[in-house]
Amino acid sequence: MKLKILILALIFVAGASFTILTQKEWPVPDKYNKMPNPLKGDAASLATGKELWAKHCQSCHGKSGKGDGSKAAQLKTTPEDLSTSEMQKQTDGALFYKTLEGREDMPSFKKKIPDQDDIWALVNYMRTLKK
């Protein structure tokens, strides 16, 4: 029994390490890194962000943003865990840019969410996902 637990723990650590190593750096232009969020994280903004999260993001990133959504296993790349301190350290502008532009399995939301204030509301909601 102890051997099974040890083997499972090693598999988990190896898988987590592989995921970390395979995450490519995602450079963000300075213009976006320095861009301030024009929306306050008030109740209305968070409600809009939560609704957009459920509609557009939850299937890959999961309800709590850990990258464990129902479609995550079908993707070539692992969805980011938005609850980590590393993700939460990113500027609002960086999160806005990544949502707007997308890359690889992460789609661009320029057309799906054409109102930029809605993307900013989504960024505000992402801030609530921290551990």
Segments predicted by a language model, with ranges:
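Sec-dependent N-terminal signal peptides
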Residues: 5-13
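C-terminal capping alpha-helices of c-type cytochrome domains
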Residues: 98-104, 111-131
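Sequence context surrounding c-type heme c attachment/ligation sites in exported
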Residues: 46-58, 73, 89-93, 103, ...
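Bacterial Sec-dependent signal peptides at the C-terminal "C-region" and cleavage site
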Residues: 14-25
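Electron-transfer interface patches adjacent to heme c in soluble/periplasmic c-type cytochromes
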Residues: 79-93, 109-119
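Periplasmic/extracellular electron-transfer cofactor-ligation site
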Residues: 29, 44, 54-77, 105-108, ...
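Electrostatic cytochrome c docking/interface patches
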Residues: 24-52
